[in-house]
């Protein structure tokens, strides 16, 4: 018969995403990157509700609507400003944790059975700010990416002891099914 049952609850931190980076210097290249991303795109596509078109990158839209890039040909773009100094700031935060509820049993000192239910959770935020200036003008590009999620997975294990000196075991862990919610934002101030 059943000799004992054990129940366990645990919390484990799987990842920590906290870090901050600041880089300063000349020629950061925000507007040049906007031009490169926009080359090949005619101005008419940026004039009428470009946010509704998933084929148009948000850097192109922000550069155009922030008056940082100008068309020079039908589908070629150049910088409308000449920034010389820049500061890039990146801030990341968040964690991935796992909550586990487990059960184990000893049956007749011959069968050992274990079951586990794992619930991983995650939260991650990345904020980026790129500021560029010259003596007269300045621009700041800000972006934010935020993801949260929760998932589920299971484990099962079995050990058979046919004699005192021999144990045969097997275990199986399911893949984790996870649901994520992602939010992004971007804006430019000139």
What is each residue range found by the language model?
Residues 3-190:
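Outer-membrane beta-barrel porins/channels
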């Amino acid at each position: 018969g059943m000799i004992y049952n054990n129940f366990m609850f645990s919390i484990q931190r799987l990842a920590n995403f906290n870090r901050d980076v600041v880089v300063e210097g000349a020629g950061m290249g925000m507007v040049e990157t906007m031009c490169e991303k926009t080359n090949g795109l005619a101005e008419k596509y940026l004039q009428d509700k470009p946010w509704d078109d998933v084929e148009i990158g948000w850097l192109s839209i922000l550069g155009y609507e922030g008056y940082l890039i100008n068309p020079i040909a039908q589908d070629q773009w150049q910088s409308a400003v000449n920034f010389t100094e820049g500061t890039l700031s990146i801030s990341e935060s968040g964690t991935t944790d796992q909550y586990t509820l487990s059960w184990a049993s000893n049956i007749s000192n011959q069968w050992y059975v274990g079951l586990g239910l794992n619930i991983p959770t995650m939260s991650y935020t990345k904020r980026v700010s790129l500021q560029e200036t010259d003596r007269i003008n300045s621009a700041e590009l800000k972006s934010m990416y935020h993801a949260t999620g929760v998932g589920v997975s299971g484990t099962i294990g079995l050990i058979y002891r046919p004699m005192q000196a021999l144990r045969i075991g097997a275990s199986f862990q399911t893949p984790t099914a996870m649901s994520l919610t992602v939010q992004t934002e971007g804006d430019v101030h000139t």
